[in-house]
Swiss-Prot record:
Signal peptide: none annotated. The keyword Transcription regulation applies. GO terms for cellular component: cytosol; protein-DNA complex. GO terms for molecular function: phosphorelay response regulator activity; transcription cis-regulatory region binding. Disulfide bonds: none annotated. This is Transcriptional activator protein IrlR. PROSITE patterns: OMPR_PHOB, RESPONSE_REGULATORY. Pfam families: Response_reg (PF00072), Trans_reg_C (PF00486). Phosphorylated by IrlS. It comes from Burkholderia pseudomallei (strain K96243). Member of the two-component regulatory system IrlR/IrlS. May be involved in invasion of eukaryotic cells and heavy-metal resistance. The modification 4-aspartylphosphate is found at residue 51. GO terms for biological process: regulation of DNA-templated transcription. Keywords: Activator, Cadmium, DNA-binding, Phosphoprotein, Transcription, Transcription regulation, Two-component regulatory system, Zinc.
Length: 229
């Protein structure tokens, strides 16, 4: 699951991004309302955590404009604790409203609750061939066999399956899964792909994760005659 954090306070933004990543989410963080609105409108997110007091556009404006064409769930996370502000946020279309200071465990519980409520809007089980990824139960299976994945492996597989058939450069994978700039001297992406292949491909046919030399990786079903790696 991919989450956008729109928060102008660096300490809070970094804390949220780190915590959500450790909880198994893919988390992007931006520091102003203009960039936040642009990201929300041009990228695909499962949830947006939005502050109210932001440079550029405030959170009210971001949500109001976003709701003109998008139904992405939004959770306000703000120091504004007035009842009128809470009502305003919910009436503008927010799915929840959390006041700072906040308990991170409770915040994650609220995030998961919102995502569960979104099940009616889109499937939470991704299927490619006999590979299944259940986003709600955080469970992967291949030919009915349960595949045990770490949080990073789950996020990596989710990214590959969500963008089935699309060649993903190493830089994109590093940014989306590890929130890091790709360095050609590091093999973190290649090593993670090898581990993931050992779990979902090595003992099964057809092979699903493929290397496109000089470009990156793609998850797709290929014909038996096509090169697999």
């Amino acid at each position: 699951m991919r989450i956008l954090i729109v928060e102008d306070e660096p300490k809070t933004g970094m804390y949220l991004r780190k915590g959500l990543t450790e909880a198994g989410f893919i988390a992007d963080w931006v520091e102003d309302g203009v960039t936040g609105l642009h990201q929300a409108e041009t990228e695909e997110y499962d949830l947006i955590i939005l502050d109210v007091m932001l440079p550029g556009h405030d959170g009210w404006t971001v949500l109001e404009r976003l709701r003109r064409a998008h139904s992405t769930p939004v959770l306000f996370l703000t120091a504004r604790d007035d009842v009128g502000d809470r009502v305003k946020g919910l009436e503008l279309g927010a799915d929840d409203y959390v006041v700072k200071p906040f308990d991170f465990v409770e915040l994650v519980a609220r995030v998961r609750s919102i995502l569960r409520r979104g099940q009616a809007r889109e499937s939470t089980v991704l299927r490619i061939a006999d590979l299944e990824l259940d986003l709600t139960r955080r469970k992967a299976t291949r030919q009915g066999d349960v595949v045990l994945l770490t949080a990073k492996e789950f996020a990596l597989l989710w990214l590959l399956m969500r963008r089935e058939g699309e060649i993903l450069p190493r830089a994109t994978i590093a940014s989306q899964v590890w929130d890091m700039n790709f360095n050609s001297d590091t093999n973190v992406v290649d090593a993670a792909i090898r581990r993931l292949r050992s779990k979902i491909d090595d003992a099964y046919e057809p092979k699903l994760i493929h290397t496109v030399r000089g470009m990156g990786y793609v998850l797709e079903v290929r014909s038996a005659s096509a090169p697999s790696r």
